[in-house]
Amino acid sequence: MASSSSSIFTGVKFSPILAPFNSGDSRRSRYLKDSRNKVRFNPSSPRLTPHRVRVEAPSLIPYNGLWAAQPNSHKGRLKRNIVSGKEATGISLSQGRNFCLTCKRNQAGIRRALPSAFVDRTAFSLSRSSLTSSLRKHSQIVNATLGPDEPHAAGTAWPDGIVAERQDLDLLPPEIDSAELEAFLGCELPSHPKLHRGQLKNGLRYLILPNKVPPNRFEAHMEVHVGSIDEEEDEQGIAHMIEHVAFLGSKKREKLLGTGARSNAYTDFHHTVFHIHSPTHTKDSEDDLFPSVLDALNEIAFHPKFLSSRVEKERRAILSELQMMNTIEYRVDCQLLQHLHSENKLGRRFPIGLEEQIKKWDVDKIRKFHERWYFPANATLYIVGDIDNIPRIVHNIEAVFGKNGLDNESTPSSPSPGAFGAMANFLVPKLPAGLGGTFSNEKTNTADQSKMIKRERHAIRPPVEHNWSLPGTSVDLKPPQIFKHELLQNFAINMFCKIPVSKVQTFGDLRNVLMKRIFLSALHFRINTRYKSSNPPFTSVELDHSDSGREGCTVTTLTVTAEPQNWQNAVKVAVQEVRRLKEFGVTRGELTRYMDALLKDSEHLAAMIDNVSSVDNLDFIMESDALSHTVMDQTQGHETLVAVAGTVTLEEVNTVGAKVLEFISDFGRPTAPLPAAIVACVPTKVHVDGVGESDFNISPDEIIESVKSGLLAPIEAEPELEVPKELISQSQLKELTLQRNPCFVPIPGSGLTKLHDKETGITQLRLSNGIAVNYKKSTTESRAGVMRLIVGGGRAAETSDSKGAVVVGVRTLSEGGRVGDFSREQVELFCVNHLINCSLESTEEFIAMEFRFTLRDNGMQAAFQLLHMVLERSVWLEDAFDRARQLYLSYFRSIPKSLERATAHKLMIAMLNGDERFVEPTPKSLQSLNLESVKDAVMSHFVGDNMEVSIVGDFSEEEIERCILDYLGTVKASHDSAKPPGSEPILFRQPTAGLQFQQVFLKDTDERACAYIAGPAPNRWGFTVDGDDLFQSVSKLPVAHDGLLKSEEQLLEGGDRELQKKLRAHPLFFGVTMGLLAEIINSRLFTTVRDSLGLTYDVSFELNLFDRLNLGWYVISVTSTPGKVYKAVDACKSVLRGLHSNQIAPRELDRAKRTLLMRHEAELKSNAYWLNLLAHLQASSVPRKELSCIKELVSLYEAASIEDIYLAYNQLRVDEDSLYSCIGIAGAQAGEEITVLSEEEEPEDVFSGVVPVGRGSSMTTRPTT
């Protein structure tokens, strides 16, 4: 089970309002089950982002707590990055793949690890502000350039972290009278000083923001303000169809691909977005790429070619996408949106559309929709990136887009509707292909009109009317809705409240958001401190209060999940805690703690202003503009937060916060706001111990009764908690130092006690207790740091009589969250106050503990104290073990309800000979475990020589080495006899077993299909499962294609030949070449299986290359339809085996190199990436990992030849005996004979679409490429 990354991130989620934050990961995020644009927070760092509090009880550890455990995440197994030491986000084959319907996009806003106590990822100072000085500061803040009639949006997500509790927080200064305060709060917030806005004569609006991360690259996004919400009854899905046809039909976009540019597109309720990520200049000629990128976007949006052949290709692609998207998560999302927005089209206009309509449209129908909506005044262009000459960019925009639409429409003067309102949009004359202004002979339909109808964007987006959940609304309570399905595993209920968006444009607006943030941040602690039994009634309780630009409203949601048999108690507990918070409010201690945390975290965020990626900034601005919030940069966000913080009072916080919760706390009262909807999603059957599967029944009346009974339960005020200032006192530290005499000792093989490499800035040390330490000073993330402990062993060290012991043990440690004499709550608050986020993870080959911290207020020292206490005085609790075991029992039982997980699980069992260490532990294995066995399984790994700590951050040499000696050096040395556990042999199953091909059939109301194809590979360092060292035979390896290799060899002369020789002798040879090979195979799979044959919508090739285990494997994942999936599997096998007959072309290798090198360059500014590079640098079980693997990485990629790629390819076992495949089919007739399409029915081409995040984010179409 790959990285069993569990994410029980109990946290607060808010809509971003201040400024985006980027932690170095600007890749499009994976599937977010929660809908809406929300950002996870830790109350530890209450940040003004989506007001969401999430409390997940199994781990009873707040999101800010030190050990928030995350149940198995499906990441980290099949997709380990080939670059040394870096683990790419991936999925565990045993757990299946998260086929996110909407997730290829990043979330707008904050992207950062949240302060939290131990998150189990196994799978896987500002003094009080003076109001007057704040006013002076405000008047000096520079404002941005404003475009005509352009609403200013607000925005940055507030940091997640919480600072040391201060009881001396002096709130409203007495010298400020109410009139002055009112005047101050009415002042407008400052606009982003570098954000340039403008509008062309034809109405096209544009925004330009210089941003240096990543360097020499920029983002260009064309947002057309039309989406599924604008479709008529017979047009459902047509906006998405146009996205496909326009984007993939653009020749100018295709030409950009050779420059290193990446592009994609997606459709949502309220808009369609085409985006290009491009270098600023071409690599060789240094030609400016801005004009070419703008020209491509112009062709895509305003000059598409609606060729019949392209329309038919995309019709087939979308129909395939529709079936692939139809997971149970998508269906749940549909249910939530249908009931939340039952009064308008948001509840029934899902972007993917309706199958029966998609099949019917002709080219003319599609073109007419484009003509109606695709015009300059209905679009906004965003350009964010490494820009040094804004006037030149403006000139390029005018030159490329300026003539569009001028010949056939009046220029809109304002965004308000015309005389015909929204209907005017449907009366616009037909413009051929939407190319107004570029054609001459095709104006016959419009030339004789005396007056053109003005085309304008809607004044309100999305153009729908809502029934608001406001007190006094004369609407009857809608009965709870129940969605039952056999593929659901747990009970989940959502109570929704829907109100208008409150624009954040003044200091008073920001103050209200801050007060709500403080109030809602308390909820997770309320629940976590009260429910500590081994079988708590709920799995998670989550309160979300967030703005949604895509839905045009603010939604507050209480979500309760639980095991079905516990659902009534879970609902009672949740509403009881909400009522307690509403009735008694937050305490003085909570107010000071959360306020301090917000100020400290926003200060840290402001210091990171130069490290936010362009795509994060752009997404944030786009969402903020949709909500009409004022956009500020991080520095402005911090200054304004400081300004309003000093005016906040406890009474106002509780008054403002209570209003948010009234729809729950006052439920049933005549004056209470009515919930917009109550929706329960439940399984049809549940597992009952000793009985098996039995029917699960629930009624609307029972739900109402459970809510009311929870509200009637007696409640008491929240007690104050004592928060430790430190986990180890100075006197204790002195005593330990005297006892253990920590010091640095010579590093094995060097004779030196300190190795420092000037080129990389990496320093290596070894402590007298055996712990190896690597650190790198980095200023790219100001005053921030990250630390990781890696302990060799992991699940591979589990024995046949302790299956699951390591993974359950790590989860147990996370669930308990205690160290020394401190309670879990004290440890959590310690982490909150010091802005520490800690996570635990167990993979197949190691256990890891990671800490993110700031260097403010001794944050690094606090993180080291926590690590010391975990190593020296961790506490193992029986009830924590019970919760951990129950979690994995539930997780195992849910496998048959997931097509992807069930298919992947069966494949892994077949390929690895039933080895349970690579899949979820079975109920039988789990029942045989006890607290002592899991504790021993985990702690036996913690032997000095088996532990390596790496740290990257903005610290000084003196600071870091003092912490290393004080807190790591004083960890008790291992006994001489102590050795980390060995591992039982890992074997691939022999072909004689006849399990090379298998199938899984899943009964479902809807049809879907997926497949996995896998086989053996070496590990990253050239070792194989058979014990071979490939470096010993690299010179004897068979060559792939004599003709090719011979001609290429002739090109290698002198230095080139020496370079190739050096590459083949380098320890990272197979890591580098396998990475390039994966890129090439991925490209071929998409081109052949998806685009040419049209057999799939989504296909990928991934390599899992271990570092410590002598094996690896490759996996091809493909989704399809039951009628095509068998041919899709055959096509994937043909591509995989076809590299000899269809030899690799130089352009394929060049593109693979460019992709990986660009990714490497972009990631180098991230502390987390450097931490990955440092992994295993001193590990005795990874002897080939050395500094050259980091220093020479770029030159290794550049030196790789086609012959080298074939040397790597020949190590993949792709013959029929070694290759394993498993096909999963879901449908009403699953298990019966599936009709396979004939050759004539096979489509010629296919492609994929996109998805943003948010409630119903699975509605958004997938990326187009």
From Swiss-Prot:
The keyword RNA-binding does not apply. Keywords: Chloroplast, Hydrolase, Metal-binding, Metalloprotease, Plastid, Protease, Transit peptide, Zinc. Binds 1 zinc ion per subunit. The keyword Zinc applies. It comes from Arabidopsis thaliana (Mouse-ear cress). InterPro entries: Metalloenz_LuxS/M16, Pept_M16_N, Peptidase_M16, Peptidase_M16_C. This is Stromal processing peptidase, chloroplastic. GO terms for cellular component: chloroplast; chloroplast stroma; mitochondrion; plastid. It is an enzyme of class 3 (hydrolase). Its main location: plastid. Its cofactor is Zn(2+). It is found in: Plastid, Chloroplast stroma. Its EC number is 3.4.24.-. GO terms for biological process: embryo development ending in seed dormancy; proteolysis. Residues 1-143 form a transit peptide. The active site is at E243 (proton acceptor), E314.
